[in-house]
C-alpha cells in the first residue's frame, strides 16, 4: 500500500483517485482503493470536517466503490466468538461454536484478519497450492469471475487448473494409496479442500473447508467485481 503524508492527505487521496481511472490491473486498483479507504477511515475518526470535505470531492463512482468496500468488510464471524489481540483483529471460536470441533480437527480455532479484511489462512493452506491469478481478474468478465465451478471459462476452474502441475506428485501418491483415479477434483474433495481467492486480487490457494466456511471474510472475487464494476479493468 502507498503511505500517506498526513499533512497533505487530501491531495494524496485525490491523486490516488486519478489512478483508479487509468490503465492499471484490477489488483493495483484494489490496492489504490484500499489506500484511499484506510485514509478516509482515519479522517472519519480524527477529523470529521476534513473527511466530509474530501468525501464530497471524490467522483460518484469512487464514492460508490468505497461504500461497497466498507460493506464487504461486514461478513466476519459474530456468534460464539471472541475478538482478541491487538486491535481485536483475531477471531477466536468459543467451544460453544457449532463448528468448533471441525475447526479444532484442522488445528485452527482462531484466525487473524488484517486491515483489509483478509484472513490469515497460511496455517491451513495446502502446500504448493498458491497460484497467481491476477491476470484472470483482468481479462475475464464479471460473469465468469463470479461463476462458481461447472465451467472451464470460470475463474475458479481456470485458477485451480494452475495448481495441478505443482500438486501432481501429491495427487499421484494419493491415487496410488487409495486406488482412486488420478484426478485433481476427486483428490481435492477427498481432502475436504476448497479454493480461497485472496483478498488482494492476486492469488488463490486451497484451504480446508470447515475453516473457510466458519471464518467468513472479504474475498478477492467480491473485491475484483467491485473494481471492474466501477473502474473497468
Feature names for model-found ranges:
Residues 2-194, 198-233:
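Nuclease and nuclease-like effector domains acting on nucleic acids or nucleotide cofactors
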